Amino acid sequence: AEGLNREQYVYLANVSEQAERYEEMVEFMQKVVVGSTPASELTVEERNLLSVAYKNVIGSLRAAWRIVSSIEQKEEGRKNDDHVSLVKHYRSKVENELTQVCATILSLLDSNLVPSASASESKVFYLKMKGDYHRYLAEFKVGDERKTATEDTMLSYKAAQDIASADLPPTHPIRLGLALNFSVFYYEILNQSDKACAMAKQAFEEAIAELDTLGEESYKDSTLIMQLLRDNLTLWTSDVQDQLDEP
C-alpha cells in the first residue's frame, strides 16, 4: 500500500479496524500523519483512528505483559529457577515490543502532532496521548528509565490539564478522559491514592454541575467517562478504607 493518498490510507485504516488488524491500522495511520503538513491537521475522524489503532496494539501488549509477569511471580514463589529465567527472558521480549510501540507514537506526537495542533481540543488530545504512552512505559520500566517516564507523564498531563481547564468545558469528553487517566497515573504509578481520589472527584463533580451544557453528540462519551471516574472512586475509596481498617 505504497504511494496512496490520504483518503485512501484513512479508508484502509477503517477496513483494517473492522478486520481487527491493528498493526496494519497503525501503519496506515502513520502514513496519514507523516503525509500531513502542519497546515493540514488531522480531522477528528483521523485523530480517533490513530488513537484506536495504537490503543489496541498497546492494549494487547500490556495485557500480555501482565500475564507473563504474574506467571513469573508464581514461578519465583515455587523456586523453579529454570522456568524463572525462561519467563524473565520472555517478559523482556514483550517489554522490547512495548518500548518500540511507545517510541513510535511518541515520536509522531513530538515531531508532527503536538507542534501542528492549533485548536485547544487537539492540543489537549495529543498531550494527553503523550502522557498515556509515557505512562505505559512507566508501568514496566525500572530505575532511571521509570523515573524519566514518570516525569514525562507528569509534564504531558500537566500541560494538557492547563489547556483543558482554561479552554474546554468540564463536560468535554477529552477533558474528562484526561482527568480519568491522570488520576489513574496518581493511583497506579505514584501510589498517591488521596491525590487520585481528589482529582477524579473534582472532575466528576464539575461535570455533574454542568450536565445541562452537554451537547447531544458528546453526551454518550461524556457520561461513559463520568461513570468510569465514579467506578474508580468507589474502588479507590474502598481500598483506602481497607488500609485504614487494617490493624
Curated annotation (Swiss-Prot):
Single Gene Ontology BP annotation: protein localization
SMART domains given in the database record: 14_3_3 (SM00101)
InterPro entries for the chain: 14-3-3 (IPR000308), 14-3-3_CS (IPR023409), 14-3-3_dom_sf (IPR036815), 14-3-3_domain (IPR023410)
GO cellular component, one term: cytoplasm
Pfam families according to UniProt: 14-3-3
Family note: Belongs to the 14-3-3 family.
Name of the protein: 14-3-3-like protein B
